[in-house]
Amino acid sequence: MSSESLTVIVGLGKTGLSCAQFLAAKNQPFAVMDSREEPPEWENFIKTYPRVELIRGQFSEKLLNEAQEIILSPGVSLQEPLIAKQAAQGKSIIGDIELFARNVNKPIIAITGSNGKTTVTTVVGLMMKAAGRNVSVCGNIGEPVLEQITPEPDYYVLELSSFQLETTFSLRSQAATILNISEDHMNRYATLQDYLRAKQRIYTDCFIPIVNADEPEIWRHLPFNKKPLSFGLNNAADFSLAEHNQKTSIAYQGKILMPIQELKLNARHHLQNALAALALGTAAKIPIENMLHVLRDFSGIRHRCQWVRKYKEIDYYNDSKGTNVGATRAAIESLGQAAKGQLILIAGGQGKGADFSPLKDVVKRYVKQVILIGEDAPLLEKTLKEITVIKHADSMNEAVKRSTQAAKAGDIVLLSPACASFDMFTNYEHRGDVFTETVEAL
């Protein structure tokens, strides 16, 4: 195999397999490696590509040296020593989003942020459909982007993570946004500023930047070519909240669009998501009637502050997607404001090096007991033990049982871990499903 044209795919999960399929269809020579002995897609891969070199259980420096280009799966860090060495030598290191961007010509709406990106991506996709457009919603949500190139839709709505943006260079979007920033993935970034810089890449070749007026530190120093469209709860913004006839309403440049009571989800973070989706939809020229219709009907996404059931006048919420401090803080604040009683929080898992101290004030205000699970339970306990009652559980079943014992009528039991799930579960969906099944069995 000629190394002049060899591409090496690093990582063989869903993304890596989609890259292999894409390159094979283009007759591009490639090889694959994964540091895991049994990566998720290896059996599929060897059945489909028995003659393609696959290295498992380690990374091969020899093979990386032979590569003209390296495609890095988002789960593999650019700081991985052998990868960092290749980058230092000037080797082209890209991800699947870059491969996608090189091969599509349809308009793209691109969305990132620490919290809310899956919800906003989903809502903008629904707005497109309501306007009669053929849309593909993909990226860090749903199917890999390379599987969405054919047949080509009218529009792409992409959810993008910081890891995906780090290895993307050719993305041109009609509109792009960073919804918000809070500490996440600090096991992959030296500082919050490094994490923000990765996110800011989304604006690089964007026609209409969409910005959060409540977090100007994200965007104020960026050299935009066009005036941004803004959204915000607390500051003057194009899409904002306004008082009208003694009701809080969503407004666009001062014009009242709808009272927030018409929304099924109207806690603060839901309103921020709605305002961001309206700004993105406006940039994509979606009629306002279609957008408002979608917002009125939208009732949320599984594992994102999802109501599970009421049992003995206690409400149970599954926010397993709350994998970072910012998401859990937002969930506590919004449910705490709405609760008749207090919150019992189930939290813990793999903290990813995060600082848990931003949870202190909302826990003090709304949470009467925290049930801790998982690897970084001791770190959470150290942060919160002076503020509220702390209990530990060895399993989700035990956590639900303890939280139910601690709750009384009017209280809310909230699973919002502020941590990744991989120490105890396959992923955050699995964690949320186990919580939901346990609650439904009460």
UniProtKB/Swiss-Prot annotation:
GO terms for molecular function: ATP binding; UDP-N-acetylmuramoylalanine-D-glutamate ligase activity. The keyword Nucleotidyltransferase does not apply. It is an enzyme of class 6 (ligase). GO terms for biological process: cell division; cell wall organization; peptidoglycan biosynthetic process; regulation of cell shape. Pathway: Cell wall biogenesis; peptidoglycan biosynthesis. It is found in: Cytoplasm. Its EC number is 6.3.2.9. Its main location: cytoplasm. It comes from the Bacteria. Cell wall formation. Catalyzes the addition of glutamate to the nucleotide precursor UDP-N-acetylmuramoyl-L-alanine (UMA). PANTHER family: UDP-N-ACETYLMURAMOYLALANINE--D-GLUTAMATE LIGASE (PTHR43692:SF1). HAMAP family: MurD. This is UDP-N-acetylmuramoylalanine--D-glutamate ligase. It comes from Coxiella burnetii (strain RSA 493 / Nine Mile phase I). The lineage of its organism: Bacteria, Pseudomonadati, Pseudomonadota, Gammaproteobacteria, Legionellales.
